[in-house]
Amino acid sequence: MASKLETLKANLEAAFGGLLLNLSEAIGELTIVVKASDYLNVATRLRDDRSLGFEQCVDLCGVDYQTYAEGAYDGPRFAAVLHLLSVQNNWRLRLRVFAPDDEVPILPSVVEIWNSVNWYEREAFDLYGIVFEGHPDLRRILTDYGFIGHPFRKDFPVSGYVEMRYDPEEKRVVYQPVTIEPREITPRVIREDRYGGLKH
């Protein structure tokens, strides 16, 4: 008798065949990768096909692969990764889709398929700059309205570009260039022979 994972893998291969750029298994979960042009069709079928039945999207996040594999990675930079759940079949799936353009990453929105992704797509837009075409309300959700840039991108400086503070003279919050000075952080070394006051 086939395991749940083997059954799901067979069902995915039967449903999508050549549309899957990659189908891999790690830590007891399957991951499929599809092209951006096939994304909506694959997502719709994942939800509607009774042999798959992924009626819930429990998470969607953006990923920046700029420094992946210590710079050895040479593929597209931005991706959206969805974690899907089938309650009726009791299985999970990870769906990954890469944005074809690294300069202006654009992917179709799947809000019409799984309405739970509404705020997830807004978060990926806010933090990574991934534009989800067809999203009903694509605007920033975590950063300030005047924020410039996307803070989870690998090329965004850790200290940011501006800081805000309350100015008592102007009686309002003001923006100013970052005043944090660069510094070298030296890790504290804990010697095993003196750890916690114990002698070995």
Swiss-Prot record:
InterPro entries: NADH_DH_suC, NADH_quin_OxRdtase_su_C/D-like, NADH_UbQ_OxRdtase_30kDa_su, NADH_UbQ_OxRdtase_CS. GO terms for molecular function: NADH dehydrogenase (ubiquinone) activity; NADH:ubiquinone reductase (non-electrogenic) activity; quinone binding. SUPFAM superfamilies: Nqo5-like. It is found in: Cell inner membrane. The keyword Signal does not apply. The keyword NAD applies. It is an enzyme of class 7 (translocase). GO terms for cellular component: plasma membrane. It is a peripheral membrane protein. It catalyses: a quinone + NADH + 5 H(+)(in) = a quinol + NAD(+) + 4 H(+)(out). Keywords: Cell inner membrane, Cell membrane, Membrane, NAD, Quinone, Translocase, Transport, Ubiquinone. Its EC number is 7.1.1.-. PANTHER family: NADH DEHYDROGENASE [UBIQUINONE] IRON-SULFUR PROTEIN 3, MITOCHONDRIAL, NADH DEHYDROGENASE UBIQUINONE IRON-SULFUR PROTEIN 3. Belongs to the complex I 30 kDa subunit family. NDH-1 is composed of 14 different subunits. Subunits NuoB, C, D, E, F, and G constitute the peripheral sector of the complex. NDH-1 shuttles electrons from NADH, via FMN and iron-sulfur (Fe-S) centers, to quinones in the respiratory chain. The immediate electron acceptor for the enzyme in this species is believed to be ubiquinone. Couples the redox reaction to proton translocation (for every two electrons transferred, four hydrogen ions are translocated across the cytoplasmic membrane), and thus conserves the redox energy in a proton gradient. HAMAP family: NDH1_NuoC. This is NADH-quinone oxidoreductase subunit C. It comes from Paraburkholderia phytofirmans (strain DSM 17436 / LMG 22146 / PsJN) (Burkholderia phytofirmans).
